[in-house]
């Protein structure tokens, strides 16, 4: 899903179903490393909820606070991800994927989903997934 470097740690996020070694309701697993050789698994970052399973996405450190989520001195880590509504998919809906946002204010140790998810509704596309976010310095925008 994504890798980001923040305050001396590499953060790796990955799709994960913690209950079995088969496909199921996806979560975002989370691991950190200081050297990219030795990894520590942290608690699951993102869990499925009423909007759906947690599919692919990306994460950034919002140094410029473009999200407006900063509190105190720590830049927020912000993740954008695909919600996959399996019940809607099973019913034949073409708009079963939307985009959600989550953030961490404690170096990725805990995550809060944005209160107004989904942040991007499906515009009528069958495959509306895998959002990527990056900072464009020339225009000072995401």
Task: Give residue ranges: language-model regions.
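Beta-rich carbohydrate-recognition and catalytic domains
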Residues: 1-131, 135-142
């Amino acid at each position: 899903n994504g890798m980001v470097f923040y305050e001396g740690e590499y953060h790796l996020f990955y799709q994960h179903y913690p209950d079995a070694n088969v496909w199921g309701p996806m979560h975002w697993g989370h691991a950190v490393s200081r050297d990219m050789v030795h990894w520590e698994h942290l608690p699951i970052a993102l869990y499925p909820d009423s909007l759906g399973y947690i599919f692919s996405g990306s994460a950034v450190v919002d140094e410029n606070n473009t999200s407006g989520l900063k509190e105190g001195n720590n830049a927020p880590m912000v993740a954008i991800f695909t919600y996959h509504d399996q019940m809607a998919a099973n019913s034949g809906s073409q708009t079963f994927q939307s985009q959600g946002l989550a953030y961490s204010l404690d170096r990725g140790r805990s995550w809060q989903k944005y209160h107004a998810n989904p942040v991007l509704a499906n515009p009528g596309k069958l495959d509306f997934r895998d959002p990527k976010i990056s900072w464009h310095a020339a225009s000072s925008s995401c």
